[in-house]
């Protein structure tokens, strides 16, 4: 596609999102409309490129399948409305097999670094700024041949001085959820045979009041500003000829400004790459028993006591009788020790037993609960970005690999209670200043209900863009009372029929936040959500979260509609609390770090009540977050509790429409992991229930408990 025009240079993040292939954009100054197209750039490569490719392939298969299922159902339309066809849901050449079933073949795609994007002017649809006459060029070559002739026309009735037209590229196009766009021009000639029209705009500013008027002298004919999508028209007319009933509104395109966000939605996803491929093995459908066992270990399910005789027999059976002799000797010595020393020795004995279990010398004595077994089996159909089991395993790996407080002057993981000199606030080299800082930090963390706060200097994260949609970012859109399928389009091929996937491999600063489990449980109880079985000693909240989880669905459809009737559960409420806290954190730190809200990303681990907020970008990390902490530290966290941060500029209007809007805690689509759903300020401060909630009683805010 590069031969169609020059290339544009922007940041890698911009090229992979705002300027990704298929987008219509204008340069600075607002003149002209251009279509971005893919070019062959540097192939993505890293020391873990094989693992990254594997994770992208796994995610894409699920994304394609979920999109297909949601689009073919169209929120129940498939059962009662006009039929839906696979070609309306997924681009055939990229995501469908010969049976028109969802398919993702990694060999048809190429992973690229977004270093350049091509572009050319399109659509070449011009309007006279004086009389409103329209003129359309078919392509760049047609424009090159004929634009001088058009510019020299002298038939403008509203330019009496020279009768010349004042041509400018029209900034409105027709768009359709099939992924197509067309110039704003009548679909057919006038009934008198004339092919030229005036665009008549209304004073109301509404597109619905615009229309086309025949330019021929004396012809009174006008046309509504409508156009049928060529792709959908060809598909449905063929079905109509065979007797299938369809409605004209399925084909009608929408007039949209090319500057409007609804014209183009780039489709992206993200993940934390794990060089250790054991995560893929453990999550494989054939490893369900091993996966269940790992969950029992992570969330501290209580083990049945094992007798000394059982330990002795097990160790002797694997030729480790000597290990038991040492164990028995230590246990006998414990009797004569003082309580403190005996406690330390008992911990050593417990560690020995756990080590033998990990080596396979001693079988674990935990019976897998039926609820865990059922969830491990059911998770194959869960949306991966909300799957608490997958995210729990990821969090466990993160704990082992990245959340370890390392040594050295430049620690990669920083405990902000004891930060190194380059992150520590000024003066904390003095003991009394450091103690005052720690006291203030401990106090505000308690008021926020935060148990753990770390800073990661280099969070390894991969974000990639793989296609786009128009009109809606999700698989369905409601237009004129009918739910329509939105077609997921891939980017056009760059070579040998390979389509680009743009990969952004980032290593930027981030904050890791984990909420206080006891406070969250208390908050759930205050909102009439008690955990059905009390947690045994040491058992973690994540155990009950996983056992009670019901799939949110890949697009959170149940939580979008104003007419939804969803019961509150410990899962959707805990997720909403965690998600809202992450947004509150981003909104606050964006003011102090010098980074805009769209420069951040979020990653949630709901079963572990933890989230990561990271700087999203491919430019060198200038240490904005560490500098922010050094300069403002506790003040940033205090702002999260301030009245201003817990209110909205929209006032009660926002409060009574779910407690989340762009004026308060909603974030750009590229930042939010859940499309700004399951989000409400009410979970932080007392407020009205979310629109999706069956229970319409007010929500008790988390901060009303943590600050009490």
Q: What role is predicted for each listed range?
A:
Residues 1-62, 193-576, 588, 606-608, ...:
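Charged, low-complexity interaction segments
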Residues 140-149, 174, 187-191, 203-204, ...:
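Short cysteine/histidine-rich zinc-coordinating motifs and their immediately flanking basic loops
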Residues 190, 194, 617, 626-708:
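Elongated scaffolding segments in large macromolecular assemblies
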